[in-house]
């Protein structure tokens, strides 16, 4: 019997399309930096952003060499883009840049059909619901709130907080240790056959794979216990709730 249902977020509960390589995005962000006195051309800003992201990843790996799949706190990058131009900013100003970046880069965002029904059913049946997401808190917290999803979760892990991502077993262990979960009572639900499903298999828990349009192409073994290949969230209940 499953008592703990662990969800991926993007591509599983939330359908999202973003474009972080669009010139218009970087032109707008460059204007916001210029408002505070940090002047960049848009292509310079894009290049510096990419460079600082890689530098942050190296710094995390140096600090935690046992981490196999690194994540970073993107706010550090946005702050450094100010400081290397000699501009001091507050935490709130950095957060605003992060939120603007996410907003300008998002082409659409919505819940998949059936998500609220699924979560309501889990809670009505006394199940525990957890989030294990490869994401940035400065992006994800707002998006959880906009869809009123936070109330459903008994625990939330966001990779930027831990500086570690799926499919790293270390990240799965963080969730299980923090909330005292048993592997035999837990199942991972996600749309990425490597990060979600491969990670769950390596960690030793069951999983359900749901294929969505933004899912990476499956190139190898799909190691899930269950699968929904047509993206129909409503089918999840029949597979892993009614028979749990």
Language model segments and positions:
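A short acidic, glycine-rich active-site loop
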Residues: 31-35, 105, 160
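Pocket-edge positions in alpha/beta enzyme catalytic cores
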Residues: 18, 66, 70, 103, ...
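Asp-based, Mg2+/Mn2+-dependent phosphohydrolase catalytic module
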Residues: 1-5, 15-19, 36, 40-43, ...
């Amino acid at each position: 019997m499953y008592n703990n249902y662990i969800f991926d977020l993007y591509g599983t509960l939330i359908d999202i399309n973003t474009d972080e390589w669009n010139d218009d995005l970087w032109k707008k962000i460059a204007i916001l930096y210029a408002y505070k006195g940090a002047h960049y051309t848009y292509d310079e800003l894009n290049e510096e952003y990419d460079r600082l992201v890689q530098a942050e990843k190296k710094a995390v790996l140096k600090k935690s060499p046992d981490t196999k799949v690194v994540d970073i706190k993107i706010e550090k990058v946005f702050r450094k883009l100010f400081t290397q131009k000699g501009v001091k900013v507050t935490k709130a100003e950095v957060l605003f840049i992060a939120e603007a970046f996410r907003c300008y880069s998002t082409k659409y965002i919505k819940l998949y059909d059936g998500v609220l029904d699924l979560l309501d059913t889990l809670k009505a049946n006394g199940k525990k619901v957890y989030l294990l997401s490869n994401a940035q808190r400065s992006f994800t917290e707002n998006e959880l709130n906009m869809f009123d999803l936070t109330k459903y979760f008994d625990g939330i892990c966001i990779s930027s907080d831990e500086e570690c991502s799926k499919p790293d077993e270390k990240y799965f262990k963080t969730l299980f240790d923090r909330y005292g979960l048993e592997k035999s009572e837990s199942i991972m639900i996600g749309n990425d056959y490597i990060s979600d499903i491969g990670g769950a298999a390596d960690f030793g828990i069951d999983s359900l794979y749901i294929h969505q349009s933004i899912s990476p192409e499956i190139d190898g073994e799909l190691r899930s216990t269950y699968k929904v290949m047509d993206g129909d969230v409503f089918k999840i209940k029949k597979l892993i709730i009614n028979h749990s």
